[in-house]
Structure formats: structure tokens, C-alpha cells
């Protein structure tokens, strides 16, 4: 349709607004063609429904309907498009990646950059500590040979969680002292920390000293040889009596008779 204030004729829709050309360059007033007083007016092509989002072009989130901004100098800039919460059709950056649950922490994931109400935590890496079970070297319920270390026979304490995986605490039982097996000539039983059985004569069990597995074997006291004893005469020593074992030497203490 035509307007008397304009030199040119334009055909516009009924819902179309116009901006007078004299107001272009500053904040334009929205007017109808009949109110334009300048030499010409231009058709405003702004949409009256929802503006096509320009700043909300993310493929992840579906923008909510943007209200049209006032038409300034033929520019239809939508009001700031606030994205709605992420829909199911979001891209990978916003879609929850299946969180593989670890054995020791069911839901210990960290949130993705697209967090808050938008996304579910992304797949988490398990930095869990797994207990390292200690196997006792003792066999049999009656064997008193083994003393457990601080980690005990059930399970070791958790080591601090590392980045890649857990460094197990080395659980080595403290070596124990061989136990004598009665009157057997090979009286020392093997200890797991000693490759061969004790070769010394009848060993008495002793307490474990640090991590060394060395029995303190005390030899039996000296027994006098039959030829050792001579009838008491001419100041000869009487029959030797065994002395108590001092250190590892067993020296007989022979008493002297008066001449």
C-alpha cells in the first residue's frame, strides 16, 4: 500500500512494522507508515514471533523461544537466548557418557564442563585402592613359627590412592625362628626365610630378632668321656663334671684333690 508521506510505494504485510529513514542511525522509534513524516520510509523485516537465535547456535542445547528485540536500524537482534536444559539429543560434550562403576566406588565421577542441571557426570576413572591380601607363610594351626607383620594375614591396609593404580603395601611376614622337633638329630625345622635347615645340634627356639632368622643354638652340656675319669690318686684330678654351658663353649670344670 502507499502512504502520502513517502515518495515511493511499498507493499508490506499487515503485521509489519516500519522505521522512518530519518531515524536510522540512532535509536529508532517504531512507527506505522502513516506516521512517517520524512521523505521516505523503509520496511522493517523483523519477525514478530520468535527471533531466529544467533547467539544460541550451540548444537548441544535447544534454545528457548527468544522474544524479538526492538527493531533498531533494521536489525532484528534477539534478546539474549538462554539455553534450556540439555535435551536428550545433545551432543557428546553435553551427553552423559556412561559412567563405568568401579568395584569400590559406585558413583565417584567428576562432572563434565556442562554440569549443573544440564548433564550427568561423565565417565570416571577408577582411582580406587584395592586391598592386597597377605598370604601367611605358616601352614597348620599348631605351627607357632610365624609372626605376622603389621599387615596381618587377612588383608593389608589400603595404600594411598595413586593416579594410575594403587601401589600395594609389601606384606612380608617377619621371619621366625626354627622350632625344635624333639629328640631328632635334625632338630630344627625349616623356616621360610632360611633356605636350608639348621645344621647345628639341638636348637632351642629363640625369639625373632628383627628380620633375621637365626636360631640361637646352644650345644648340650659336655658329657665326660669314660677315659676322662681316673681313680683319685697321686693328685690326679677326679672325674670331670660338666660345667654349665657358657657362651658356646662347654668346658669341664675339673676339681682337684689334695695330695
From Swiss-Prot:
Family according to the record: Belongs to the KRTAP type 10 family.
Disulphide-bonded residues: none
Keyword Repeat found: yes
Domain of life (superkingdom): Eukaryota
Presence of keyword Thylakoid: no
Membrane-crossing segments per the record: none
Phenotype when changing residue 64 to N: In a colorectal cancer sample; somatic mutation
Function: In the hair cortex, hair keratin intermediate filaments are embedded in an interfilamentous matrix, consisting of hair keratin-associated proteins (KRTAP), which are essential for the formation of a rigid and resistant hair shaft through their extensive disulfide bond cross-linking with abundant cysteine residues of hair keratins. The matrix proteins include the high-sulfur and high-glycine-tyrosine keratins.
Listed PANTHER family: KERATIN ASSOCIATED PROTEIN (PTHR23262), KERATIN-ASSOCIATED PROTEIN 10-8 (PTHR23262:SF149)
19 X 5 AA repeats of C-C-X(3): region residues: 26-243
Positions in coiled-coil regions: none
Annotated protein name in UniProt: Keratin-associated protein 10-8
Subunit annotation: Interacts with hair keratins.
Source organism phylogeny: Eukaryota, Metazoa, Chordata, Craniata, Vertebrata
Tissue spec: Restricted to a narrow region of the hair fiber cuticle, lying approximately 20 cell layers above the apex of the dermal papilla of the hair root; not detected in any other tissues.
Residue ranges of Sequence repeats: 50-54, 60-64, 65-69, 98-102, 108-112, 118-122, 123-127, 133-137, 145-149, 155-159, 165-169, 170-174, 175-179, 187-191, 197-201, 202-206, 221-225, 228-232, 239-243
Sorted UniProt keywords: Keratin, Repeat
GO molecular function: identical protein binding
One GO cellular component term: cytosol
